[in-house]
């Protein structure tokens, strides 16, 4: 019997009416949709496409994608609305692979601009800019006309991967040609593209030009331009823009400025901006307070952070929570119990909370606890792995970082460019040049060669592996540079003794309009110190406050003192210490002690050492430097006194360790090491080298033997077994003639070993690179890049 058409129509209308009541994100809506769906199945009703499409839409917007897909698969020939809805649903949930699968199965004749827009938007929102651009090009090739939404979406993807100004201009021209270029949403996206690729002031100028031409600016227009200024360090222009804004839009702009100041390390400026907000009568909101907490956390302002926390708790009209920011505040201020207590009291601990906890332990150097947290986490995402891998590397656990990176891949996580950056940092810690090259090759193969984070990590890795030319090459070929890129190259050149070139790069950076931050100034001061560029170093130090409004920290003052001591200006160094705006820290006294050791200034050196004994009595380096000074002048009673002081205080000298990498295998040597299978052959080879070097004038400096041994022969034997000498002899035996030898040591190399390496490079006619705790030494033809000051 044929069903009554009127009855069918009535049932269909009732279902449609019920589904129209379903609103996204309401639990009752999902329940109603399920009831309708169940009723359809129970009574065997065959609904038309518009009802099925509405059901799929409700399921997708309620994040019930399994139900949506089940219903979608039951449709013999889904129409373009159903396909587009599924694409949007998968993209919103971050499952780009399934979204792409639905899109690619749609016949070209069924696709339209809306379906392309959904897929392009999905790529952009899920940080796959290249795929967004490629699909945009394919869309045009297949004859589909992009609309305003298409351009806004693809430009969001372009902002992620823009290589250069030419690419930005090409898309800008295409938008103008289509008539979409003056639409506010598209113009906002163009401002974002130019700002995010602002490797030069001209691009930021282009962003401002687009902004000025927007006829109907909305809140996003102002905040996008503001964010562009802030992220590129142009806070003065940001403040000018702020003054021209309507009062009802200033809250978001203030938030952007505050967040930008915090991200760039200008914490006092961020807090001053908060004060201005309050005095202007602008209410702080849920976006302001987390930035304030971050500023307090990074600046160590625990009491202010607690006051903000207490204030928010008293505000009944605040329904938001920022427990994750509070966890960071207490961790960074060393209050681990309070941080853990906040975490434990969280009513719902999501993955973000766990990652915040993990990051807190990692950033505070508590790697043991971080490992336990990581193991405890029932769910992990790629960010969890990134935090742990980078944390291991940054805390000196390079080998564990590489193992965890391999484990991550075995667990089925595809490494992103940030994960690769963590692995590359691990290679930098170990000096694992061959491994680093392999990761570089993988990055190129996968298509991450334009990644900013990976590029910056590669510069540092090659520099720390002693291959500064490859660090230069990575920098030159990076499509986009930020201040971290410039900092990495300046640091690389400074570490390797290319101080003048480091200064040239810094000046080039300034000419390009890139504003230095506190790290930039620290690296250029270090470069000046290593190269003995006293006048330039002092000029750059003075510019910190006078030009860039960056108050120097203890680390900057330490570099200045090191610079002055290098040139023997001890009275100037003392004057700097006396005029410090804070109590001298350990690193400042250590810089003074190091300079005294090199120049033999015993009186001032003893003062510096006494200060260090008071600040860090457990640090073995102070005792060793002071012992070296006394030993150099034959004061063996004083050497014995310092050694006894170490024993009485329970201070143990860190074991010296040197290593060399050969074909991804690392060979490690300790002092007096006989554990290596080829140890006997290495010592015989060392003796032969010593004879040849003595013939050419090398005399072992026995003042670096920190024991009162009567026999010079015995003293010389003790010097022969230093770990870096064993490592370099092994390298000379095993590596082909002409190969550069790269040795890494965990402590500062002694004066005799330094002299030994100078003569050795002349005898064997090879370049030898030694990385010790302080810097790099490039030995060639009997000379060292450090100029015998380290």
UniProtKB/Swiss-Prot annotation:
Pfam families: DYW_deaminase, E_motif, PPR, PPR_2. Keywords: Repeat. SUPFAM superfamilies: TPR-like (SSF48452). The keyword Repeat applies. Gene3D superfamilies: Tetratricopeptide repeat domain (1.25.40.10). PPR repeats lie at residues 48-82, 84-109, 112-146, 147-182, 183-217, 218-248, 250-284, 285-315, 319-349, 350-384, 385-415, 416-450, 451-481, 482-516, 517-551, 553-583. Residues 588-663 are annotated as: Type E motif. GO terms for biological process: RNA modification. InterPro entries: DYW_dom, E_motif, Pentatricopeptide_rpt, PPR_At4g14850-like_plant, TPR-like_helical_dom_sf. One of its GO terms (molecular function) is RNA binding. Residues 664-694 are annotated as: Type E(+) motif. Residues 695-790 are annotated as: Type DYW motif. NCBIfam families: PPR (TIGR00756). Belongs to the PPR family. PCMP-H subfamily. This is Pentatricopeptide repeat-containing protein At1g25360. It comes from Arabidopsis thaliana (Mouse-ear cress). The gene is PCMP-H74.
């Amino acid at each position: 019997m044929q069903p009554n058409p009127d009855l069918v129509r009535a049932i269909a209308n009732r279902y449609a009416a019920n589904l129209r009541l379903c609103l996204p994100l309401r639990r009752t809506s999902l329940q109603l949709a399920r009831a309708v769906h169940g009723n359809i199945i129970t009574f065997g009703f065959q609904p038309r496409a518009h009802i099925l499409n509405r059901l799929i839409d409700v399921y997708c917007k309620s994040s019930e994608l399994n139900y949506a897909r089940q219903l979608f698969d039951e449709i013999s020939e889904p129409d373009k609305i159903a396909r587009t809805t599924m694409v949007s649903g998968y993209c919103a949930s971050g499952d780009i692979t399934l979204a792409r699968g639905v899109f690619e199965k749609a016949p070209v004749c069924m696709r339209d601009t809306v379906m392309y827009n959904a897929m392009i938007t999905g790529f952009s929102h899920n940080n796959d800019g290249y795929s967004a651009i490629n699909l945009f090009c394919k869309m045009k090739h297949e004859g589909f006309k992009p609309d305003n939404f298409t351009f806004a979406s693809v430009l969001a993807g372009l902002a992620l991967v823009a290589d250069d100004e030419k690419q930005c201009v090409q898309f800008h021209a295409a938008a103008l040609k289509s008539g979409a270029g003056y639409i506010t949403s598209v113009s906002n996206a163009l401002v974002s593209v130019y700002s995010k690729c602002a490797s030069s002031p001209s691009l930021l100028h282009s962003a401002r030009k687009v902004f000025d031409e927007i006829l109907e600016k909305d809140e996003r227009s102002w905040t996008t331009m503001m964010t562009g200024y802030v992220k590129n360090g142009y806070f003065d222009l940001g403040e000018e823009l702020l003054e021209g804004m309507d009062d009802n839009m200033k809250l978001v702009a203030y938030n952007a400025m505050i967040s930008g100041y915090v991200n760039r390390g200008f914490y006092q400026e961020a807090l001053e901006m908060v004060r201005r907000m309050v005095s202007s009568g602008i209410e702080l909101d849920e976006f302001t307070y987390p930035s304030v907490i971050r500023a307090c956390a990074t600046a160590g302002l625990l009491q202010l952070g607690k006051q903000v926390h207490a204030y928010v708790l008293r505000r009944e009209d605040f329904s938001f929570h920022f427990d994750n920011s509070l966890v960071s505040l207490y961790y960074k201020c060393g209050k681990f119990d309070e941080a853990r207590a906040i975490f434990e009291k969280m009513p719902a601990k999501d993955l973000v909370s766990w990652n915040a906890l993990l990051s807190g332990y990692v950033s505070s150097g508590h790697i043991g606890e971080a490992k336990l947290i990581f193991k405890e986490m029932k769910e992990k995402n790629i960010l969890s792995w990134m935090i742990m891998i980078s944390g291991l590397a940054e805390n000196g656990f390079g080998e564990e970082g590489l193992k965890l990176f391999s484990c991550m891949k075995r667990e089925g996580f595809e490494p992103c460019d940030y994960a690769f950056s963590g692995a590359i940092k691990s290679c930098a810690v170990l000096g694992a040049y061959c491994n680093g090259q392999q990761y570089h090759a993988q990055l190129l193969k996968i298509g991450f060669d334009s990644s900013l984070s990976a590029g910056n990590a590669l510069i540092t890795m090659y520099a720390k592996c002693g291959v500064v030319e490859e660090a230069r090459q990575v920098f030159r070929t990076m499509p986009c540079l930020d201040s971290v890129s410039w900092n990495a190259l300046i640091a690389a050149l400074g570490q390797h003794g290319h101080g003048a070139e480091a200064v040239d790069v810094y000046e080039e950076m300034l000419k390009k309009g890139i504003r230095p931050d506190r790290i930039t100034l620290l690296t250029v001061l270090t470069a000046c110190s290593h190269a003995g560029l006293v006048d330039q170093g002092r000029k750059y130090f003075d510019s910190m406050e006078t030009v860039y409004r960056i108050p120097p920290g203890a680390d900057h003052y330490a570099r200045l003192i090191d610079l002055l001591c290098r040139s023997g200006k001890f009275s100037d160094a003392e004057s700097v210490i006396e005029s410090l705006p804070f109590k001298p820290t350990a690193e400042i006294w250590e810089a003074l002690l190091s300079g005294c050791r090199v120049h033999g200034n015993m009186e001032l050196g003893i003062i510096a050492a006494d200060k260090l004994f008071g600040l860090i009595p457990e640090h073995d380096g102070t005792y060793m430097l002071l012992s070296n000074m006394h030993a150099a002048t034959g004061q063996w009673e004083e050497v014995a006194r310092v050694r006894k002081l170490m024993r009485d205080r329970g201070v143990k000298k860190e074991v010296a360790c040197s290593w060399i990498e050969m074909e991804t295998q690392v060979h490690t040597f300790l002092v007096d090491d006989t554990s290596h299978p080829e140890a006997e052959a290495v010592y015989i080879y060392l003796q032969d080298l010593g004879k040849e070097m003595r013939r050419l004038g090398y005399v072992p400096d026995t003042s670096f033997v920190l024991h009162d041994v009567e026999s010079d022969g015995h003293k010389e034997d003790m010097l022969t077994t230093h770990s870096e000498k064993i490592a370099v002899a092994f390298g000379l035996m095993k590596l082909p003639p002409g190969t550069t030898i790269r040795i890494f040591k965990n402590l500062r190399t002694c004066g005799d070993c330094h002299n030994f390496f100078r003569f050795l490079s002349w005898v064997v006619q090879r370049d030898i690179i030694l990385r010790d705790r302080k810097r790099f030494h490039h030995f060639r033809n009997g000379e060292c890049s450090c100029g015998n000051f380290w």
